[in-house]
Amino acid sequence: MNPNITILFSTRIIRLFCYGFLSVILALYLSEAGFTETQIGLLFTLTLLGDAVISLWLTTSADRFGRKRTLLIGAVLMMGAGIGFVLTKNFALLALAAIIGVISPGGSDIGPFLSVEQASLTQLISNEKRTHFFAWYNLVGSFATATGALAGGWLAQSPIVLF
């Protein structure tokens, strides 16, 4: 099997595990940080709007930038947003991180990764095996999201002080 297929599957599993984890923990973290429900809702809304704009820009530019570079740009934006959420509790800075970062407060793969990965996989997999690979691609993604949410739920219920 092409090693690029393994890389695409592996990064999807890691990313969707994190998205599932965030879907449980992020609102709790923001609440513990002192944000109101309105602020948390606004931050999530800005996150989704930012994801839509960044995704549109990256996916329409993916072939010009190169698909690998596009996936790396998305990963760097996601990492930057995560660092921003860890380092500050300033609402304006968190809003900026939410807008430009590619994170998913709802646990679904809504960023640029899905379309770029799928386009890449269609070039790496023969027509005869494509349905089989895409079935596994979706299954492992769903399983990773569910496992991440489960891990987030366990952590949220644990007696360990998180924030």
Region locations from a protein language model:
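Helix-to-loop junctions at the C-terminal end of transmembrane segments
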Residues: V53-G66, A156
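Hydrophobic core of transmembrane alpha-helices in multi-pass small-molecule transporters
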Residues: I13, A81, F91-P112
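Loop-to-transmembrane helix entry/capping segments in MFS-fold secondary transporters
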Residues: E37-T38, P112-F113, I125-Y137
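Transmembrane alpha-helix termini and helix-breaking/packing motifs in multi-pass membrane transporters
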Residues: A27-L28, E32, T145-F163
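Helix-loop boundary and gating motifs at the non-cytosolic
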Residues: M1-A52
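Structural signature of the two symmetry-related core transmembrane helices
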Residues: R69-G84
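Residue-level signature of mid-helix packing/kink "hotspots" within the transmembrane helices
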Residues: L48-L56, T145-A146
